[in-house]
Swiss-Prot record:
PANTHER family registered for this protein in UniProt: BARRIER TO AUTOINTEGRATION FACTOR 2, BARRIER-TO-AUTOINTEGRATION FACTOR
Function text: Non-specific DNA-binding protein that plays key roles in mitotic nuclear reassembly, chromatin organization, DNA damage response, gene expression and intrinsic immunity against foreign DNA. Contains two non-specific double-stranded DNA (dsDNA)-binding sites which promote DNA cross-bridging. Plays a key role in nuclear membrane reformation at the end of mitosis by driving formation of a single nucleus in a spindle-independent manner.
Modified residues annotated as Phosphothreonine in this record: 2-3
Alphabetized UniProt keyword annotations: Acetylation, Chromosome, Cytoplasm, DNA-binding, Nucleus, Phosphoprotein
Annotated positions of the N-acetylmethionine modification: 1
Subunit structure: Homodimer. Heterodimerizes with BANF2. Interacts with ANKLE2/LEM4, leading to decreased phosphorylation by VRK1 and promoting dephosphorylation by protein phosphatase 2A (PP2A). Binds non-specifically to double-stranded DNA, and is found as a hexamer or dodecamer upon DNA binding. Binds to LEM domain-containing nuclear proteins such as LEMD3/MAN1, TMPO/LAP2 and EMD (emerin). Interacts with ANKLE1 (via LEM domain); the interaction may favor BANF1 dimerization. Interacts with CRX and LMNA (lamin-A). Binds linker histone H1.1 and core histones H3. Interacts with LEMD2 (via LEM domain).
GO molecular function terms attached to this record: DNA binding; double-stranded DNA binding; protein homodimerization activity
Keyword Nucleus: yes
Modified how: Ser-4 is the major site of phosphorylation as compared to Thr-2 and Thr-3. Phosphorylation on Thr-2; Thr-3 and Ser-4 disrupts its ability to bind DNA and reduces its ability to bind LEM domain-containing proteins. Non phosphorylated BAF seems to enhance binding between EMD and LMNA. Dephosphorylated by protein phosphatase 2A (PP2A) following interaction with ANKLE2/LEM4 during mitotic exit, leading to mitotic nuclear envelope reassembly.
Lineage summary: Eukaryota, Metazoa, Chordata, Craniata, Vertebrata
Protein name (record): Barrier-to-autointegration factor
Length: 89
């Protein structure tokens, strides 16, 4: 599977205070929905990812329920966070 430039940029460095929209799979619409629910930074979404024990099915279902992410968006976001964790945790 090839990854987007957005994905590669995200996993290339520590997360810091990056906005939630910097995550692969999260565009303007999903970013706004997540922000409205308190997930304004990428690290807040990472926290949920970790609470769900990095489980792909649970995380993707949570993302769908929380902001309406489709299958590709949730898969891209999951892959981005998984790869970031592999590199930095």
């Amino acid at each position: 599977m090839t990854t987007s430039q957005k994905h590669r940029d995200f996993v290339a460095e520590p997360m810091g205070e990056k906005p939630v929209g910097s995550l692969a799979g999260i565009g303007d619409v999903l970013s706004k929905r997540l922000e409205e629910r308190g997930f304004d930074k990428a690290y807040v979404v990472l926290g949920q990812f970790l609470v769900l024990k990095k489980d792909e099915d649970l995380f993707r279902e949570w993302l769908k329920d929380t902001c309406g992410a489709n299958a590709k968006q949730s898969r891209d976001c999951f892959g981005c966070l998984r790869e970031w964790c592999d590199a930095f945790l």
